[in-house]
A protein has these predicted regions:
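CE4/NodB-like, metal-dependent polysaccharide N-deacetylase domain
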Residues: 130-151, 171
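Active-site mouth loops of central-metabolism enzymes
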Residues: 54-65, 115-128, 254
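N-terminal binding-site loop/beta-alpha segment at the start of enzyme catalytic domains
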Residues: 1-109
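Structural preference for beta-strand elements that scaffold enzyme active sites
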Residues: 47-49, 82, 108-112, 146-149, ...
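Acidic-and-aromatic substrate-binding clefts and catalytic sites of carbohydrate-active enzymes
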Residues: 58-59, 86-94, 118-125, 153-160, ...
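A short, structured active-site edge motif that brings together acidic residues
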Residues: 107-121, 150-153
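Beta/alpha (TIM)-barrel catalytic core signal, keyed to glycine-rich beta->alpha loops juxtaposed to Asp/Glu
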Residues: 5, 155-261
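Short, acidic/polar
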Residues: 62-74, 126-140, 184-192
Length: 261
């Protein structure tokens, strides 16, 4: 469970604790799980989830994935549910699906995966057959239907790929759909997609040293009732690199923190 102390540790670098609404602070004090509602449905999700594009992906490509099993179990044991992955994350999607199946935890996970069958760097339209094949593979390796969320990765060929996942949602095979962009230069395209398509989620990068999404994307998402997945909230390792070798400030001891990590 994410408690007040845990969240303050996560927020120490961002100053976010001073901006929290009173309802959220009250939840911390009561040691309640901190959640946010998906605007389109009202379904609550814990505010902290698990990504799989970096360290998770590297370990997934190794022979011993027991550490990943422990990570997923720890997430679920503490009330988390969201696991974000993608076919392009090496073995991450397949291995996380195997772990969920082998441990009997598949149905406890909110699976968020992606689709992008556009040839890398080509700018060509996606082949509809390849789009459908990639989607069917995600159903197969994650072993859950309906899948909770599938997003078009990096705004790639939205007419083709958004069309495909919209059809699957209408068929009841996907619960939520969306799109992602981690490139601020493409945020105007993301804004337009948010207005043009009936999406439930977007995914963007946001960290204390990367707040571009807060200028237009996050306010627009709020206005349109679109849920947001935040990627790399610590800038991968940037924030920890900047504090390497620095003493933890005295005020951090007030919530039991003795390390920047």
């Amino acid at each position: 469970m994410l408690t007040r102390r845990d969240y303050l540790k996560l927020s120490a670098l961002t100053g976010a604790a001073s901006l929290l609404p009173s309802s959220l602070l009250a939840a911390f004090d009561a040691d309640q799980l901190i959640t946010r509602a998906i605007p389109k449905s009202g379904e609550d999700l814990p505010i902290v989830g698990l990504g799989s594009s970096a360290t998770f992906r590297k370990v997934a490509q190794s022979e011993d994935v027991s550490a990943l099993t422990d990570v997923i179990k720890t997430l679920l044991d503490n009330g988390g549910t969201v696991l974000d992955t993608a076919p392009s994350y090496g073995a991450a999607e397949e291995v996380s699906g195997e772990i969920g199946h082998d441990t009997g935890l598949t149905d406890r996970i909110f699976w968020a995966t992606k689709v992008n069958a556009v040839p890398r760097g080509s700018g060509d339209p996606a082949d509809p057959d390849k789009v459908n094949a990639q989607l069917e593979r995600s159903f197969k390796v994650l072993r859950k239907e309906p899948l909770d969320l599938i997003q078009v990765h990096n705004l790639a060929d939205l007419p083709t790929q958004m069309g495909a996942i919209r059809e699957l949602k209408e068929e009841g095979r996907i619960r939520y759909i969306g799109t992602t962009s981690t490139n601020p230069r493409r945020y105007p395209e993301l804004e337009q997609a948010m207005k043009d398509y009936p999406i439930d989620f977007i995914g963007v990068d946001y960290a204390v040293d990367n707040r571009t999404a807060a200028e237009r994307i996050l306010p627009l998402a709020e206005d349109l009732g679109i849920a947001t997945l935040i990627y790399v909230p610590f800038g991968r390792s940037r924030l920890f690199s900047r504090t390497s070798g620095m003493d933890v400030p005295e005020w951090a001891l007030e919530f039991g923190s003795t390390s920047w990590v």
